[in-house]
Amino acid sequence: MLKLRYPLTFVLLLGACASAVAGPIAAGKQRVLGSEYSPSQSKDFTNDWDGDVPENAGKWGSVEAVRGQMNWGPLDEAYQLAKRNHMQFQFHCGLWGAQQPTWVRNLPPNEQRAAIEHWFAAIAQRYPDIDLMQVANETLPGHNQPDNRRADSGNYLRALGGTGATGVDWVLEAFRLARKYFPHTKLMINDYNVTEYNDQARQYLHTIQLLQQEHLIDAIGIQGHLSSNGPSVSVQRANLDLLASTGLPIYITEFDLDGRTDAQQLAAWQRFFPMFWEHPAVRGVNLWGFRHGLWRENEGAYLINYDGSERPALTWLRSYVASRP
């Protein structure tokens, strides 16, 4: 009879430790699986994710609410976490028509442009190793362009050239500035509803192709805030294919799904997540939170309960990703 060299309790302890340090869900996979990083999402973050995108800490209005006074602390935390743990760091976001400093709204256009360049230069100097830079967020008509609708919209669209002959001159100029200040960083655009709605996919494609003509864009961002009863997989896959026709890699930047019941959430994840994860153009998926306190709290998008237990969708996600290349 073979004698056990180590007590059973020691063997079990070793197994538990190995499980605890097994690494992120997508470790060793062909795609990155990450999450937004914020105080409510920070607990055990590195256990599951190998991508890190700050939720609000990188928005201009969060950093420079008072002109010339830079609050880098929360953004430093997200960036340093990524670098310490060899995670992909995606900067969210350079320019957006929301959560912008209110002081920029009433500046003359030439001063607004100078302020934008100062903002870009400050980011580039402090964070030299950004992997992916979301230059402009939600640029499509009717989304969140930096116009004068609200006090925090920025009102600097004209300072970047307005809509102009292309309809998106300001977006092109934003990317020209980004290429100047981030010459070694992969630049991306980001928007929502671009897989769900054909017209928005085509508008997005138009902007992207104009950026490509000047070699200003390196990746496409698709937010991925989906509804369990949203447009069909076939519709969304066709729009993914349309955007993939550019030859650019695609990143799902803010993925979440409603799930007021475990069964509803699980079914939605099983229906929609593989559509993205298995698409050949998609290089990564970032969730827009996974714990309570995330943006779609009321819709039940969280994957971990208050007591720390996993909802079935997260258990399924681990198994599904493990089964894929």
Residues covered by each model-derived region:
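Aromatic-lined carbohydrate-recognition surfaces of secreted/lumenal glycan-active proteins
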Residues: 25-27, 31-37, 132-135, 167-201, ...
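Boundary/entry segment of secreted carbohydrate-active catalytic domains
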Residues: 23-57
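Acidic-and-aromatic substrate-binding clefts and catalytic sites of carbohydrate-active enzymes
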Residues: 33-44, 60-73, 100-101, 140-142, ...
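Aromatic- and acid-rich polysaccharide-binding/catalytic face
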Residues: 50-57, 131, 137, 185-191, ...
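Short, acidic/polar
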Residues: 36-48, 113-123, 198-211, 268-275
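Bacterial N-terminal signal peptides that target proteins for export
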Residues: 1-8
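Substrate-binding cleft and catalytic face of glycoside hydrolase catalytic domains
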Residues: 47-65, 73-194, 242, 259-261
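Substrate-binding cleft of secreted/luminal carbohydrate-active enzymes
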Residues: 260-308
